[in-house]
């Protein structure tokens, strides 16, 4: 097949070579636009790829998990299940709290999802309990996303109730108003309230019941409209002393009369200022505190949000008393900034290394300056396009630019080398620039579009992984396009003005020595190539062996999803026996905190005990361990986690589960460990049968560690078995029984105190200090139909049973989540396969379904599409090359280089002990685009030699290989050195960048060595095949 002859008049570069001023000003414009774009771009850890997620929390103090599920969660789930665009709905119903997490499709705007959620809540309102203290509250936040900032508020002079009141009113509300903030939570449970603790014996002796007291309190404290008077000349608003504001006022409240004497609330109860929920507590290090966690909205920029908070914080803290101390314990943006700074440093290092290699090859300062200008100009110009595409400066886009350093210099090198060759032959610089640029223009276009073709499949990757790498692929493609433009405009213009025979011939001792070295290398390569061309079948067997080895390595290499990052923050879950009380759990938490804070890598610790929207049961505690900066500690986060777990194992009666926080959050639940696997059934009974069996087998697998389940069905329950006949005969209804129990043991919110700034609750309960445990039930009294007082024990028996501490649903069906980590000597792929094999051995019934969740599910999806992604990249490149060369054969020759890149990348990953994760796969796809450049440069010149000089195919490819050896070696080394800083990365976020560098460096080294010999052999093989095919067709035509 024929290709278009290269122009000797400069081609598309002619206009720019002949008009240097216009070309210079055009490049200055690109430079200024890029600088302005860089300053305007936001900074983040990763591209914003969050699923639209909304959390709905409903609190119903005193309700059991079963009541929460049936009375609150189920009605809401039925309404939410009808929403369009809903991807997944999970819920957790625990004692007094229902948390529903709604994850929507990526294409659905968060504001639209918010409107649908509000409409669903409104539709479910009439189905919820009438005495629900507050309606369901939704937040635009992913509960599994770690807080962007954690603050601890402490005071040595003020009670925690006053501290929380001030913080909630003066600080939390203001922070909630900041753009990008999704939720501000105050952990510690010290919200002010008036607590009424009834003396059961006292009210029994007076013939009263708790319901009598509750009715008296609710009737005595009201805040409703009273109207106004409108006279002939004046209007008067009516008001009254219907509100009671303090504990003293409640203490004086008359609740009944006996023999004409008043019975005041203080006579039968202890009334005091206290906390609304006494079973909640938070600590910062070892000090009781109010812990403020700030979470961002899905899609919000974490850096700008945190900057806004820090800017406002001094003003907010000034409004607090001096005895109140606000401490920032963690700020995720600190590590994000450090990671981005390290990546920017590696980008600058890559540019410096690339320029150094250029000088090593060209041995000429003017010739080195030209690509030294082209490289930063191409990269800086990319920022201008990124602004228009709403991208950000993040680890992936900076990685793309770092890799692009090796790409964009290739075009400039090829142009300079070709123009320099003509100048050295005696051509005038201007004529050489026109001739050299015209000759190489088609090659530049081929290189550019075939490389961009490799990136096209990345743009069509589905789900969150596709969104994640879209910015990477487009940023890299834009840099390559700008590089091609610069190489066809600025580079030849500068060559025509800066290069000359004198400058190129001017040599020093270094240049003469390096010239001799390169001449010897080229001569040695020529001798080796001649031998290889004489033994083509041996070379072909090597090429086929690399293809087979690539397949074998692909099958056996450990596979992962996303590198585990060291962001300096560890999330933890502390688990105690299921019957543990709040006091018992708080004591255990303090023991564990003492152990953790002794570790030299730990900077601070926050912990929380109690049941709320984030913690499902009293026997668990949430921990956040903040590590010292990476340069102030000796070990990475995984070693710190292992050390902490070993230390905490010595604390009796608790299990500690730890996992490092990650920039990429795909999960919607706060789990104990990194990976999740769910078991779903149509009933809780089915789960209770199969969960223990599966857990027993999974805990024996060496591929898994820290295996745990959120299935807790051994919570103690005091079951009140009422004799309904006896109760009915006395005129006592089940509602009366429930009310009596709720009044006594539910921390019941019975009334509201309204102030100008806030609202506070009146909490009713029995004082159980003298009657702990089940004995407190003997003090319950009910009112019969004739007004008499009836002990609960006369109509009911108390049975001790077991029940789940929380009930979880996934898409409205009961589910349990099994969490696990992966040991160091295994990969996530090994763990997933082991779980699937174990599941098959159990023969689960058809009503039991299993599914991986979060990052494990994303891993399966990414792994399934990886092969097709690579195939798509190869096909896309074949189509582009076929169109450019007008040939079916030459693209195959070019693509024959790919297995060598795969072998090199996979071997490098194995040697380095890295998994084949999505970052490494991106590196392999980029290698597909890089290594074919060698073949393109060889084939272009071989075809031109055959066409213009009448050489035989063997002579043409031999001369092309020797002629293009130096630029091939130079461009490969430039790409290799561009990836080298990533491979050697050790700073913050290095775990994310290193697999890309390792794969690319390994692939480039192996492919460079092999393709210099295999490509010419395959070129000649296909040439002979084409001639044989033509002769066969010609013979058939003659016979016909």
Swiss-Prot record:
Subunit description: Part of a tripartite efflux system composed of MdtA, MdtB and MdtC. MdtB forms a heteromultimer with MdtC.
The entry's keywords: Cell inner membrane, Cell membrane, Membrane, Transmembrane, Transmembrane helix, Transport
Any Pfam family matching the protein: ACR_tran
GO MF annotation list: xenobiotic transmembrane transporter activity
Gene: mdtB
Subcellular locations according to the entry: Cell inner membrane
Coiled-coil portions: none
Family matches, as Gene3D superfamilies: Multidrug efflux transporter AcrB pore domain, Multidrug efflux transporter AcrB pore domain like, Multidrug efflux transporter AcrB TolC docking domain, DN and DC subdomains, Multidrug efflux transporter AcrB transmembrane domain
Transmembrane portions of the chain: 16-36, 347-367, 369-389, 396-416, 440-460, 472-492, 537-557, 863-883, 888-908, 911-931, 968-988, 998-1018
Function: The MdtABC tripartite complex confers resistance against novobiocin and deoxycholate.
GO cellular component: plasma membrane
Inducing stimuli: The mdtABC operon is transcriptionally activated by BaeR.
Family, as annotated: Belongs to the resistance-nodulation-cell division (RND) (TC 2.A.6) family. MdtB subfamily.
Protein name: Multidrug resistance protein MdtB
Membrane topology, from the record: Multi-pass membrane protein
Domain of life: Bacteria
Alphabetical list of InterPro entries matching this protein: AcrB_DN_DC_subdom (IPR027463), Acrflvin-R (IPR001036), Multidrug-R_MdtB (IPR022831)
């Amino acid at each position: 097949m024929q290709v278009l002859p290269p122009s000797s008049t400069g081609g598309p570069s002619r206009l720019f070579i002949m008009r240097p001023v216009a070309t210079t000003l055009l490049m200055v414009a690109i430079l200024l636009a890029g600088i302005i774009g860089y300053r305007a771009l936001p900074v983040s850890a990763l591209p914003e790829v969050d699923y639209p997620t909304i959390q709905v929390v409903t609190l119903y103090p005193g309700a059991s998990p079963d009541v929460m599920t049936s009375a609150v969660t189920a009605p809401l789930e039925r309404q939410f299940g009808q929403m369009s665009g809903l991807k997944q709905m999970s819920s957790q119903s625990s004692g007094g709290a229902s948390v529903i997490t709604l994850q929507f499709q990526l294409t659905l705007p968060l504001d639209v999802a918010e409107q649908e959620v509000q409409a669903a809540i409104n539709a479910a309102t009439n189905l919820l309990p009438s005495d629900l203290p507050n309606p369901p509250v939704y937040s635009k936040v992913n509960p599994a996303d770690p807080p962007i900032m954690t603050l601890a508020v402490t005071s040595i002079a003020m009670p925690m109730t006053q501290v929380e009141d001030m913080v909630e009113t003066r600080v939390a509300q203001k922070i909630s108003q900041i753009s990008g903030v999704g939720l501000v939570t105050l952990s510690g449970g010290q919200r002010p309230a008036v607590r009424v603790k009834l003396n059961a014996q006292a009210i029994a002796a007076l013939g009263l019941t708790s319901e009598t007291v509750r009715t008296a309190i609710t009737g005595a404290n009201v805040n409703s409209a009273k109207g106004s008077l409108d006279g002939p000349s004046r209007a008067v608003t009516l008001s009254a002393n219907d509100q009671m504001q303090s504990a003293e006022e409640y203490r004086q409240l008359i609740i009944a009369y006996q023999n004409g004497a008043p019975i005041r609330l203080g006579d039968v109860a202890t009334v005091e200022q206290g906390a609304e929920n006494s079973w909640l507590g938070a600590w910062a290090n070892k000090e009781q505190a109010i812990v403020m966690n700030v979470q961002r909205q899905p899609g919000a920029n974490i850096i700008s949000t945190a900057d806004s908070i820090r800017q406002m914080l001094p003003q907010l803290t000034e409004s607090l008393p001096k005895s109140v101390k606000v401490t920032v314990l963690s700020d995720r943006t600190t590590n994000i900034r450090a990671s981005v700074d390290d990546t920017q440093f590696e980008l600058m290092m890559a540019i410096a290394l690339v320029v150094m290699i250029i000088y090593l090859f060209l041995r000429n300062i003017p010739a080195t300056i030209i690509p030294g200008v082209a490289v930063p100009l191409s990269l800086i110009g990319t920022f201008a396009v990124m602004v228009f595409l709403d991208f950000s400066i993040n680890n992936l886009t900076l990685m793309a630019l770092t890799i692009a350093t090796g790409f964009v210099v290739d075009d400039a090198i090829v142009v300079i080398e070709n123009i320099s060759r003509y100048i050295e032959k005696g051509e005038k610089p201007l004529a050489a620039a026109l001739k050299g640029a015209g000759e190489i223009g088609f090659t530049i276009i081929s290189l550019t579009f075939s490389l961009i073709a490799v990136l096209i499949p990345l743009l069509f990757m589905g789900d969150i992984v596709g969104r994640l790498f879209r910015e990477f692929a487009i940023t890299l493609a834009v840099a390559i396009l700008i590089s091609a433009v610069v190489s066809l405009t600025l580079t030849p213009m500068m060559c025509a003005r800066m290069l000359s025979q004198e400058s190129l011939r001017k040599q020093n001792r270094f240049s003469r020595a390096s010239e001799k070295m390169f001449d010897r290398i080229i001569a040695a390569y020529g001798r080796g190539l001649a031998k290889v061309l004489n033994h083509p079948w041996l070379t072909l067997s090597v090429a086929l062996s690399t293809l087979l080895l690539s397949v074998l390595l692909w099958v056996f290499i450990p596979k992962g999803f996303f590198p585990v990052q060291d962001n300096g923050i560890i999330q933890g879950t502390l688990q105690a026996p299921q019957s543990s009380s709040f006091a018992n759990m708080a004591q255990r938490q303090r023991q564990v905190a003492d152990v953790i804070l002794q570790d030299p890598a730990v900077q601070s610790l926050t912990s929380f005990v109690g049941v709320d929207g984030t913690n499902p049961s009293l026997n668990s505690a949430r921990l956040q361990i903040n590590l010292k900066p990476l340069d102030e500690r000796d070990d990475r986060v995984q070693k710190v986690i292992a050390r902490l777990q070993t230390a905490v194992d010595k604390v009796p009666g608790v299990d500690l589960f730890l996992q490092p926080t990650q920039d990429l959050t795909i999960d919607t639940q706060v789990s104990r460990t990194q990976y999740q696997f769910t078991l779903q059934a149509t009933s809780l009974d089915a789960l209770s049968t199969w969960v223990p069996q599966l857990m027993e087998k999974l805990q024996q697998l060496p591929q898994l560690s820290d295996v745990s389940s959120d299935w807790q069905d051994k919570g103690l329950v005091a079951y009140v078995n009422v004799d309904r006949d006896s109760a009915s005969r006395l005129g006592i209804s089940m509602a009366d029984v429930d009310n009596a129990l709720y009044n006594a043991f539910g921390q019941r919110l019975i009334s509201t105190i309204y102030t100008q700034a806030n609202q506070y609750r009146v909490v009713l309960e029995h004082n159980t200090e003298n009657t702990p445990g089940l004995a407190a039930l003997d003090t319950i009294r009910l009112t019969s139909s004739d007004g008499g007082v009836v002990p609960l024990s006369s109509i009911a028996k108390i049975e001790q049973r077991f029940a789940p501490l929380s009930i979880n649903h996934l898409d409205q069906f009961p589910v349990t989540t099994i969490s696990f980590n992966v040991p160091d000597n295994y990969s996530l792929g090994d763990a997933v396969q082991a779980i699937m094999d174990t599941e098959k051995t159990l023969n689960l019934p058809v009503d039991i379904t299993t599914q991986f969740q979060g990052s494990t599910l994303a891993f399966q999806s990414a792994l399934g599409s990886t092969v097709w992604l690579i195939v798509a990249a190869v096909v896309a490149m074949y189509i582009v090359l076929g169109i450019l060369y007008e040939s079916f054969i030459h693209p195959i020759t070019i693509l024959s280089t790919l297995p060598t890149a795969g072998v090199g990348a996979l071997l490098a990953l194995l040697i380095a002990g890295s998994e084949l994760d999505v970052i490494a796969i991106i590196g392999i796809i980029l290698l597909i685009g890089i290594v074919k450049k060698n073949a393109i440069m060889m084939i272009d010149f071989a075809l031109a030699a055959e066409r213009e000089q009448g050489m035989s195919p063997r002579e043409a490819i031999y001369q092309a290989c020797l002629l293009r050896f130096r630029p091939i070696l130079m461009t490969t080394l430039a790409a290799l050195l561009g990836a080298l800083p990533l491979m050697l990365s050790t700073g913050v976020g290095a775990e994310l960048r290193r697999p890309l560098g390792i794969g690319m460096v390994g692939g480039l080294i192996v492919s460079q060595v092999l393709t210099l010999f295999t490509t010419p052999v395959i070129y000649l093989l296909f040439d002979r095949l084409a001639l044989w095919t033509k002769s066969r067709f010609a013979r058939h035509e003659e016979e016909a």
